[in-house]
Amino acid sequence: MEVHNSLHCTAPVLSSLQASASGSGTPKKTAASSAAAQNSKQLLDQLSQQQKAQEEAETHSRRDCDSPASSNSEPEKDLDELRDLNGSLTGSGSVGKSNGSLSGASSTTSAPAGTSTPGSANTNGSASGAASLSVVSATAHLKKRITSSRTPTRKAHRIKFYRNGDRFYPGITIPVSNERYRSFESLYEDLTRLLEENVKIPGAVRTIYDMVGKKITALEELEDGQSYVCSCNNENFKKVDYNTSSQPLANLTLANNSRTSSHRLAKLQRPASPLKNGVLNSIAPVPVGGGAAANGSPLNTSRFSERDSVVHPRIVTLIRNGTKPRRIIRLLLNKRNSPSFDHVLTAITQVVRLDTGYVRKVFTLSGVSVLQLSDFFGSDDVFFAYGTERVNTVEDFKLESEEQRAINAIRKTLRTAGTACKGPKPKMPVKSKKAYPPGELKAQAEAQLQASAAPANEDEEQAALLKSTGVEVAELPAAIRDNYTLSQIIGDGNFAIVLKIKDRQTGIPHALKIIDKSKCKGKEHYIDAEVRVMKKLHHPHIISLIMDVDQDTNMYLVLEYVSGGDLFDAITQVTRFSESQSRIMIRHLGSAMSYLHSMGIVHRDIKPENLLVELDDFGNVVQLKLADFGLACEVTEPLYAVCGTPTYVAPEILLEVGYGLKIDVWAAGIILYILLCGFPPFVAPDNQQEPLFDAIISGVYEFPDPYWSDIGDGVRDLIANMLQSDPDVRFTSEDILDHYWTMGNEEIGCGDYSR
């Protein structure tokens, strides 16, 4: 290891050492001089050990040393000077190679023999004392330089980080240095982990801003003692009065071994929501490492355990105080914007926009004052919002007919439980792509084998199998042809076919997707986007990409194989699923969507055909995986391209007003509805698109009897929140996982559905 801060004996230090040597050459050495010699000897030993360690390190690595000899010259020189100094103090040796030999006798001034010299004793004594002080000063100076050479790293900056747009969050303070964080990605990872432990965030930290909204692009721009704002999922900077006066809830300073701590969970095991990453945790959060909270703060534990036990996603209706008829607004409350009572007031303030400013008072429809967080998540779902103005309890809490009609229209979808279905039962839409039902796969494979007339070898068998697909065996990439054996066709679409293949060594089945580029003219960017997105994904409920090979005519993707087929075929066979089976599937789908959305990726084509299922021996679904990322893309701004499958398309896509991640939630709501009753909520005669699109845009649907008579209110509430026409109040993918029905806590409830 190269010593960058080499030791240098300056001229004043050397002169003081020489003076101490001449003073110590008198016959009468003082006790102070002896002590100085002792200190100098100890210092010499320290420097010798340092030089030895340096030489050993240099034998292993000389990468950054242009001149090893020159790099050692200064420490060696200092070492020689200290050796000479030590010899002088003990009465022998010479001081300094470059300064010539200086013996102890020649450095003293004594009177001739027999001559009386008054005061000579005092002179020698004072010189000895001065020399001792000089030696002590010199050794202290050198010790300081030795210490500095051993600690070349600079002190880490202590920096506070806030959550973007959260004016109540007190922030976290962590040390930041180039030694601790080699890149922004490692800093983002730690900030994401720390924020998830204290507040609900919509995804991973992706951007850091200073307090005026300037984007930080390099670690060197972070200044010691300053504050910065963390943004998730490419959010724009929100200029609010951040809580700079409050102390953090807990000391969240990272320990030096935080990167390798056994208490730190991997990202896949640290869901912001219990089901985010496909694992159902208990309702009460279990602190990492045992009893106390992960950051050791009792206050932190009590605050967030209250939030987790009280807060669940729901949409509330707000009546803005003002001239009648008053404005009525809807607001989605969840664990991300409602961790405390003050946070809810802030969220209400931002949507109602009172003339008097900040919302100070909230009342229920019956006039009861809302004083605590749990009041927003009880039986009441309509609230009056006031500022500092006076409340007239007699007139203000009386709804006009126009206001009552508006509230009833909002509740309409929750009042259709007793509606009888008129006419025949609606049907499922036609499958949007060709696929072979599971029962026909075996027959198809047998027919192909018989038609091949018992091929002489495996190569001929594979050639016969590919013949109908238009793909020649010789065209297959060597990496696929040499490592996998081809099996039956398990599906095809407009641009691709899918074959079942097996690993020649392990026998593990996979799926081979062959995309015909000639059929994708002008749409090649979709193929590139699919591969690019899938390479980023690693999740238990998302199909894994194992290998991709790009050729001039075809793109070959080796994918994870799921034996149960797709969900569309499963629905066709059983017609409808129980609530418990539907809960399993929506958990897995919500987990996959939450993972995608945390990375800023929207799927854009969620439908039963793109959901693959694993079945147990009794035909029950035990696992669901999301597949086919041909339309997936990263969202950095509103999207306007009209795409997807008609039955599952969200209204904002049809209206072409711009859309984002929540179109996936709409599609998942349609699927959940289908799972429970066997048909979609929006239908049109003969699957005509225009009437279907009109129905989707209207947002009006029902839960008709007898198909919904045995289905509970909890899942109806979840569907109603997933199928909100306004994307601002529609559930997020995390809200799906946080909903009490999804978590199996239907005793919590969410209001009265009989109104």
Curated annotation (Swiss-Prot):
Pfam families: DCX, Pkinase. InterPro entries: Doublecortin_dom, Doublecortin_dom_sf, Kinase-like_dom_sf, Prot_kinase_dom, Ser/Thr_kinase_AS. The active site is at D605 (proton acceptor). GO terms for molecular function: ATP binding; protein serine kinase activity; protein serine/threonine kinase activity. ATP binds at I490, G491, D492, G493, N494, F495, A496, I497, V498, K513. GO terms for biological process: intracellular signal transduction. Keywords: ATP-binding, Kinase, Nucleotide-binding, Phosphoprotein, Repeat, Serine/threonine-protein kinase, Transferase. SMART domains: DCX, S_TKc. Residues 87-99 have a biased composition (Polar residues). It is an enzyme of class 2 (transferase). The keyword Kinase applies. Residues 18-52, 100-128 have a biased composition (Low complexity). Residues 484-742 form the Protein kinase domain. It comes from the Eukaryota. Residues 53-66, 74-84 have a biased composition (Basic and acidic residues). Residues 157-243, 314-397 form the Doublecortin domain. Its EC number is 2.7.11.1. Belongs to the protein kinase superfamily. CAMK Ser/Thr protein kinase family. CaMK subfamily. This is Serine/threonine-protein kinase GA29083. It comes from Drosophila pseudoobscura pseudoobscura (Fruit fly).
